[in-house]
Amino acid sequence: MKTAMTAESTLYDAQTIRERVRAAGVVGAGGAGFPAHVKLQAQVDTFLVNAAECEPMLKVDQQLMAVQAERLIRGVQYAMTATGARAGIIALKEKYQRAINALTPLLPAGIRLHILPDVYPAGDEVLTIWMATGRRVPPAALPVSVGVVVNNVQTVLNITRAVEQQYPVTRRTLTVNGAVARPITLTVPIGMSLREVLALAGGATVDDPGFINGGPMMGGLITSLDTPVSKTTGGLLVLPKSHALIQRRMQDERTVLSVAKTVCEQCRLCTDLCPRHLIGHELSPHLLVRAVNYQQAATPQLLLTALTCSECNVCESVACPVGISPMRINRMLKRELRALNHRYEGPLNPEDEMAKYRLIPVKRLITKLGLSDWYHDAPLTETDYPTDKTTLLLRQHIGASAIPCVLQGEHVVRGQCVADVPSGALGAPVHASIDGIVSEITEQSITVIRG
């Protein structure tokens, strides 16, 4: 098995791999949607699969690895060929035993598993690199600066399909969890509405639900269930609207700043538990809270450190004893600093000797977040769920929006490119996820009706 898989991966050269990944519209499925073909242009010594899936309510990657182990390993080999990497690492948690058992007998030379503890935020790209390789990415730098390219499980599986079948990204696997009748992990057409996705899980079980796109720590508030599934939709979390996780996300920025100025006690727990600070970054959330509260404390260099915040939300959801959100403050600062084209430059300090002991055990995190009553297994189903309407966002990735290459009224088939980015621009094409008629084209999306 190992020999056959290794031989198959040698059928394609680096340029072919990158071209097919680009044509298929593969983007980072676990983050902001960085185009995968651009990452594969880097030349590094290590390709790392971030399979930690540290958000406690999401159950996608851990289950996909168990049932698609061969495809995942072939994808790692294609990525290694494209990047020139000599080493491939799949970093996953010890508790993912089904995945470990499926992957271990298939590992070829040059690819290994790295077992992670069940802590948050082990799935943060920079933290995963540190835990799996011992290398520390400097603040404001990319993983390539330390010789590593990182993708998550679903991205690597999409790379395999793109290379072997020239199959574009038209489906997304996501978890529906929390206050739903049937917690589930399922694969749906890109562009299906979250309203339909919720119905597939049996609907909400509370009278006045709130919704989060993604996990409880980093996911954003959903204001409309008509929002379509995109290439980066990680999950649909349903909770009572009265739940603290929903209420915090509903706070406006003025309230966030007012709370910070009123109750901050300068205990510095937010900094002591900040994962980026622990590995040597200059970022100190308590000093940034102080800076927005008291102008005389706001030096230019201090404010710029906000640009290095990963928005992992440890400071707000775990560290702060009085309900302040340093993360939201950092997000505001980042928006203003980026609007002025400011960039951060600063040192990589020695890592904290207590760093590995200050990451948050996920069991404790679930309790701290008030999720014990809403935490479910959400088993994976391989059912193909159809839909009669898809709304395909033209910007499901970092970079320029895709430009429609079809006309209203045109018949399209699943897998057909309906929008692409200009040559040389950062971005990724968008493909039809169902057969149908283009019913509407706007600046933001293309709507396809089955027919």
From Swiss-Prot:
Annotated residues for binding of [4Fe-4S] cluster 2 = C309, C312, C315, C320
Q: What is its main location?
A: other
Please give a single GO biological process term from the UniProt record: propanediol catabolic process
One GO MF term attached to the UniProt entry: 4 iron, 4 sulfur cluster binding
Q: How is the cofactor bound?
A: Binds 2 [4Fe-4S] clusters. The two centers are coupled but must possess different redox potentials. Binds one FMN non-covalently per monomer.
Report which superkingdom the organism of origin falls in. Bacteria
Cofactor(s) named in the record? [4Fe-4S] cluster; FMN
Concerning its family, UniProt says: Belongs to the PduS cobalamin reductase family.
Q: Fetch the PANTHER family from UniProt.
A: ION-TRANSLOCATING OXIDOREDUCTASE COMPLEX SUBUNIT C (PTHR43034:SF2)
Q: Function, please?
A: A bifunctional cobalamin reductase that converts cob(III)alamin to cob(II)alamin and then to cob(I)alamin in the bacterial microcompartment (BMC) dedicated to 1,2-propanediol (1,2-PD) degradation. PduS and PduO allow regeneration of the adenosylcobalamin cofactor within the BMC. Cobalamin reduction probably occurs spontaneously in the presence of free reduced flavin nucleotides, this protein may be involved in electron transfer for this reduction. Expression of a cosmid containing the full 21-gene pdu operon in E.coli allows E.coli to grow on 1,2-propanediol (1,2-PD) with the appearance of BMCs in its cytoplasm.
Q: What is this protein called?
A: Cobalamin reductase PduS
Recorded source organism is Citrobacter freundii
Q: Which classification does the entry list for the species?
A: Bacteria, Pseudomonadati, Pseudomonadota, Gammaproteobacteria, Enterobacterales
